[in-house]
């Protein structure tokens, strides 16, 4: 794994540098703009899946500021990460707030689709950039509205997915029974705490990556 500072001031971590296609993982945030951190959910997914998919270059993004109030800043970091990924075929994986970030970036030529993991898809979010792409969503049934991130719930992401379907965007919607918000948290010591049903999140993500890897 290598780390790289983006021109925007954000950061990326890259696994499987020689992969011929890319998966760019954009993460969540809070209401108050705070310095970005590495996503525990993204880190666990890459740890589990990078060895299984050597053909995929995994690019994790750390925003300068992680907040839905700084969405434009997060999108700029994501766009810089797509450039750093440097592949003609790229899947965007957006967790929580990252769902909106990924949708905002979907029109990028190299992007073939978006995989939203418990994504934040507010009703005012324009989905036109998804035309000609895919939108697949995975959400835990026990996820609920979180402080600082209005609208993160299975009902919200389902509504966003159905809006995309009405635009002719193909994709699947998968629920994880009793699944929470993502598959991991960060411990006080910096390690990963795996949430219940984390294997289901890994399996659902792997199913989409199978198509990407070809």
Label each PLM-derived region with a short phrase.
Residues 67-85, 201:
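Alpha/beta-hydrolase active-site loop
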Residues 131, 136-143:
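Short beta-strand/loop motif that positions the catalytic acidic residue
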Residues 165-214:
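C-terminal catalytic histidine-bearing segment of alpha/beta-hydrolase fold enzymes
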Residues 93-102:
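Gly/Ala-rich beta-loop-alpha elbow adjacent to hydrolase catalytic centers
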Residues 37-48, 142-171:
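Active-site-adjacent alpha-helix of alpha/beta-hydrolase-fold enzymes
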Residues 110-121:
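A conserved short beta-strand
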Residues 101-105, 125:
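Hydrolases whose catalytic domains are alpha/beta-hydrolase-1, hotdog thioesterase
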Residues 3-55:
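Short, surface-exposed "cap/lid" segments of acyl-processing enzymes
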